[in-house]
């Protein structure tokens, strides 16, 4: 398997793990917020505001995973080293 194939595979696995964690975290946050509003409807404004801030923090994990995956795919700092190594091995 080539270096670039490994980069694509690593980026795909990294993005999958990042979004899986984000989805689970957001689901648990919304579940807790809905339970809190059902117990105390008067505090729904504060609960929803806190939930939205929490969801933004949770979503940042997926954004960071996406940025790292894009760096791996398009701006890989090891690309030149891998190409030189491949040329050396081919000789």
Curated annotation (Swiss-Prot):
One of its GO terms (molecular function) is lipid binding. Keywords: ATP synthesis, Cell inner membrane, Cell membrane, CF(0), Hydrogen ion transport, Ion transport, Lipid-binding, Membrane, Transmembrane, Transmembrane helix, Transport. It is found in: Cell inner membrane. Its main location: membrane. The chain crosses the membrane at residues 4-24, 53-73. It is a multi-pass membrane protein. The keyword Nucleotide-binding does not apply. Gene3D superfamilies: lithium bound rotor ring of v- atpase. SUPFAM superfamilies: F1F0 ATP synthase subunit C. Belongs to the ATPase C chain family. F-type ATPases have 2 components, F(1) - the catalytic core - and F(0) - the membrane proton channel. F(1) has five subunits: alpha(3), beta(3), gamma(1), delta(1), epsilon(1). F(0) has three main subunits: a(1), b(2) and c(10-14). The alpha and beta chains form an alternating ring which encloses part of the gamma chain. F(1) is attached to F(0) by a central stalk formed by the gamma and epsilon chains, while a peripheral stalk is formed by the delta and b chains. This is ATP synthase subunit c 2. It comes from Pelobacter propionicus (strain DSM 2379 / NBRC 103807 / OttBd1). The gene is atpE2.
């Amino acid at each position: 398997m080539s270096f670039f194939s490994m980069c694509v595979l690593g980026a795909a696995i990294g993005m999958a793990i990042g979004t899986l964690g984000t989805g689970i975290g957001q689901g648990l946050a919304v579940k807790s917020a809905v339970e809190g509003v059902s117990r105390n409807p008067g505090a729904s404004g504060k609960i929803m505001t806190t939930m939205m801030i929490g969801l933004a923090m949770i979503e940042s994990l997926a954004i960071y995973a996406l940025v790292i995956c894009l760096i791996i795919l398009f701006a890989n700092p090891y690309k030149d080293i891998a190409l030189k190594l491949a040329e050396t091995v081919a000789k």
